[in-house]
């Protein structure tokens, strides 16, 4: 079935359904992809609220009650919620979620609804807006989501891109990029290059390293998922691989997709501390921009994490929102009152705009 809001190949959502993250279960019976998963209620809370809650007496004993089994509409492998291209009105979709997962789970969430995204068509943006309005009319609480970073490829050379950064940022970036001389970079198409289990194992180990040091632990993707996506030759996937020029050791990789005329950055694996010492975050950023420019692509879509760093590198941002249905009416009223405390990226945007 075709979906709206697709920035990546539809095959990714298929691999997600076949190999869901650890502790996740795919839900059936809706006209859109859906899953159930445990949600830590503090995941997107602002730092002040987190600190106050964690300082409460006996937090370690009762904190497990903050993890709630939740029904989600969407996936964790698509930038936006895949919504139906045909057949379901916004009102019918909202009702299906409210009377399905909304009754089965304490929380039901339509995640990652776009908000007038410059990366989507007018029709897709209008449908997402109509879904949000239909949800609000049926008792959902709308909560601001994360900041999706992107860079329009509206420059003719990397020199022109760098000229748009401040002098101090250009100097800092050039200093970090000197480590490129000690690296061997390869572009590997997904498919045959990952036929051997050892190749998948090496990539998955570096994904696990990134997951282990991440502040937010929501979806832990499985080795089976990575085996499927890395071996999918039809998806348009490209692994940017970074090895030490002297030893040949794998220091990191970055899995991207060319789709809809854009380069979409999806997954990364890093070998710590060597990857940090080689400044792979910044090296891979420039490698991806150079690739998108050389291929005549329109955008580099850079994902959700580290918005402040990406802002310093010239990224722009488009925001999502989540439609949250709370089954218990009293808690629903509380959720509406305190929703703003769970919009950490919106608070970052407001602070950045005021700076």
What are these model-derived regions, one by one?
Residues 1-355:
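N-acyltransferase acceptor-side catalytic subdomain
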